[in-house]
Amino acid sequence: MTKEIEIHSDKSVVPIEKIRSYLEAMNMASNLTKAEVNQFIEIASAYGLNPFKREIYASKYGSNFSIIVGFETYLKRAERSGKLAGWSVNTSGTIDWSNIMASDLCATITIYRKDWNYPFIHSVYFSEYVQRKNDGTPNKFWREKPYTMIKKVAMAQGFRLCFSDENGGLPYTSERSEEHTSEL
């Protein structure tokens, strides 16, 4: 009797030079240090993340540099595991724009796995995740689309936690303002 192991990988690895050319075409290469460009390329390559599919982004605002994984990437990896049985995300509460810390807007994700007896439930609160400008007011996205933004945080965190084997080690998603973020 022979045992065969078949490995399936649908990683669409983008060649390093194409990623570098893309950074240049998006005018990001001139904003990033050589070390930041190399870090971005290494992470994209190591995890099979394709910037052309918007699976990974680079964000540079002032001297701050972040590598951001799109929340859809976590969902795709959960689906590919064959263990995802369903999910839903809902919001409750309201926003007090005069005192954001008093807001009780919450997004809750419920994820069902085929190999678990109980659903995974995770909640995040607007007051804890709202991204602010230097003056303390919510940035454009969080001001204009607060429900969408808090749902995206719940989804990214929920799938990352519930499918840690599939998503472990990926850079954490961050919901930042397009005013301060350059997408790749």
PLM region spans:
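Glycine-rich anion-binding surface patch
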Residues: M1-E178, S182
